[in-house]
Amino acid sequence: MITLYLDMDGVLADFNKEYMKLDPNKTDRKRFRSAVIEDKIFEKLDFMPDAAELLNHVSRLNGINIEILTSMGTHDPFQGNAAKMQKLNWLKAKNIPYKANFVREKKEKAQYATPTSILIDDSSGCVIPFHAAGGHGILHINAADTIRTLDNTILQINSLQALSK
C-alpha cells in the first residue's frame, strides 16, 4: 500500500505569514523559540491559499494511506513538545483527520522513505533526502502542480508493483 505523507508548514499551514509578524530584532533561533513557547505560533496558522484543493484531492484517493509528516524544528525536548501539541491542536481545529508523525529536523523525514511512500513538502531539504533514501519526494510549490505530480507518481508506483508480481 502506498503511504502519502503531507508536510504541514508551507504545504497545509502558512507558517511564514504568521512568523513574519513576530519581533525581527531577535536572532532567528530566539525568535523561533519565542514564537513556539510564548506565542504558540503553530495554533495560529492560516491554511495555505490552496491547501483546501490539495486536501480535497488526497481525501478522494482510493487505497492510499495518508499521514502528516512534520518537523518540530528543534532538538530541545521542551520546545519540541510544545510545537507537537500546538500542531496536533491545529490539525484537530482544522478537522484534518490524518495520523501525525513528528521529527526533530527536516532531514529526519527520510527515515519514513520506502519504495511505496510519497512525501509532499515545500522544502528541498526534506524532499532530496527522502528521495535519496528510496522514497518519492514531491517539491510543493502549488496545489495544481503537486496534484499532477502526485497522480503520476501513484501511477508509477502502482505500475512498478504490478510488474513485480
Question: What are the residue ranges of the model-derived segments?
Answer:
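Active-site neighborhood of HAD-like aspartate-dependent phosphohydrolases
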Residues: M1-E43, N142
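A short, conserved beta-to-alpha structural element at the edge of catalytic cores
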Residues: S34-E43, I138-L139, A143-N158
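Acidic, Mg2+-coordinating phosphoryl-transfer loop and its flanking beta/alpha structural elements
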Residues: I118-D151
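Short hydrophobic segments within beta-strands
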Residues: D7, L69-S71, I120
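Substrate-recognition element of Asp-dependent hydrolases with the DxDx(T/V) motif
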Residues: D46-F47, A51-K84, L91
